[in-house]
Amino acid sequence: MQAIVIAALVSVGVIAQAQQPTTAARPTLPAPDPPPSPAAMIARSKALELNTPYVPPPGDPLVHQAAGFAKVICSAVFITGLDPDFAAENVGYFTAPYEIRAKLGKPVVDREHKQVHVAVPGGVTRTAVFLGDQGCVTLPVGKDSVSFKPLELKSTLPDASTQTWPMGDLLRNEPPAPELNMAKVKQAVDAAFDPPEAKTAAFLVAWRGRLIAERYAPGITAQTPLESWSMGKSVTATLMGVLIQQGAYELWQPAPIPEWQEETNDLRSEIRIADLLHMSSGLRIKAPEDPDYDPTGTYADHFYLYTGGMNSFHYAATRPLQWFPGKVGRYRNTDPVLTNYLIRLAVENRGEEYLWFPRRALFDKLGMRTMVLETDPFGNFLAQGYEFASARDWARLGNLYLQDGIWNGERMLPEGFAKFVSTPAPAWVADHRPIYGGFFWINGDGEYPVPRNAYFMSGAGGQKTMIIPSHDLVVVRLGHFKGANEANQSFKNALALLMEAVPPNK
């Protein structure tokens, strides 16, 4: 059975068992704006394109997909705690497409050595190894170890069960606030799990910083770290915001990537940190959300930055410019990878341990105990999408933004940073797509039945953390990747019901 928790004002008040699945309420949803013409986007980008070469990633795509499959199963088993056969059927299609899995050997899980091996028929075997607090890492072909020293990152926080929300998981029993329609909230939770094919694993609603509802699929708890994919880009933005608040960088300064300083007149040296956060660097790679993407062509760099088993920072830094910075917005993993590069440079330049930085500077301060950031074999965070966390931890991060970057009286993010990440990037607006800010998506086209100033973290497979300032709401939905096709609609249905359940701010 799925447990449902409903409450108001302070966390959870009433704990009850969910009823047998019923048909959830299906509200009428407003129509979003029509999408821009791909042809017009392509034409505009072609007119601005620079004459630079494109060199695809090296290696056999099937070998890269085997690496992705091994890593996905490794993380599912050793981080989330899933059964390997369930994981092979249900999770992580992004770097290991379901249709490709039949072409590969069945994952071999070595629990003693905490490794997963996937063989390419007639070829190499790719291996992912669990490294504790660095999660699972794909080993380079021919290597049996990583090129960095893994660290145990123990939280300094007390046991979560002894601390009240949000710094802990202890939930106080208080009656619902009279202005909330808790029957509608219950309907919204039902809608988030309907249909079962959506594979929703966790759904959580926080109002004014306090939990008012949550439910988990069988085998999943409030402390289970789940696949979150590109919601990690928003973690990356937050870590950069912390560094800016600490004085390490300025938002609009040129990004001091070492590879761009080696030659005079390297136009990449004009890429600003804000351009990276805006997904508007102009760097040339192949990515699946490009309007002219051909999935039958060469293996996309966007995936290779996960599966290549190389120094991801150096690979991203050595891509040429396709457009001048800030002119064309494209959803490409180079930009968050390079932002993580800048994070490492700043942390190590002041003599601190890079792998410790997220926990000390962010996670422990917010009460986030479950977040795992995975790395490449060189110890570089792949926080463009290789991270795992519980729904409650994603809600904590969302509430930091709802509170304008202030937590327990401390300004953790610069004043105006939350507005920056939630304001449409100019290069995206130029394509009539007011949907992307600073490593956060924006409801600027009305795709979701919430106000258009709502903004959200989003990951492949239907992962969402929606921040709705007009209603003081943070809504988290996590699920298994196989349900991606149904997940978005069920999430929209849940949001529409929440808009009926929760009054707007006065």
Regions found by a protein language model. Give the residues of each.
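Structural helix-adjacent loops and short alpha-helical linkers that scaffold large soluble proteins
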Residues: 84, 247-251, 344-359, 405-413, ...
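Beta-lactamase-like hydrolase cores
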Residues: 168-208
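Short, charged, amphipathic alpha-helices and their helix-cap/turn boundaries
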Residues: 183-185, 189-191, 210-215, 249, ...
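Active-site SXXK
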Residues: 209, 226-252, 276, 339-343, ...
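Active-site-proximal alpha-helical segments within enzyme catalytic domains
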Residues: 237, 279, 335-344, 385-407, ...
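Active-site helix/loop module of the DD-peptidase/beta-lactamase fold
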Residues: 246-284, 288, 318-322, 348-385, ...
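Active-site Gly/Thr loop motif
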Residues: 368-375, 419-474
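Structured C-terminal helix/loop/strand segments within mature extracytoplasmic catalytic/sensor domains
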Residues: 457-506
